[in-house]
Amino acid sequence: MGKLKILVVDDESRMRKLVKDFLMKKDFDVLEAGDGEQAVDIFFEEKDIALIILDVMMPKMDGWQVCREIRAHSRVPIIML
């Protein structure tokens, strides 16, 4: 079995790096998105995402909009920050 894949979504690159570094040390495969639109695109391209860590306040598409879009198609766990 491969590593669990986690999508980290935050418009602040420092926060993304902090979370990514922590998760990679725990042996997770980490994908990053800098805004909501990018997050939705990545989610639908990568079918095996096990968890999404999602910032609420972002440009283009906020976290609530991203959550609604993904929830319409998937029950993947989402942690809102």
Predicted regions and their residues:
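Non-catalytic signal-transmission and effector/linker regions of two-component phosphorelay proteins
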Residues: 1-7
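Short acidic/polar segment at the start of the alpha1 helix of CheY-like receiver
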Residues: 12-16
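Charged docking surfaces used in two-component/phosphorelay signaling
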Residues: 17-25
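Acidic, metal-coordinating helix/loop segments flanking the phosphotransfer/catalytic sites
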Residues: 32-51
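Conserved phosphotransfer cores of two-component systems
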Residues: 44-47, 69-76
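The short loop immediately C-terminal to the conserved phospho-acceptor aspartate in CheY-like receiver
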Residues: 56-57
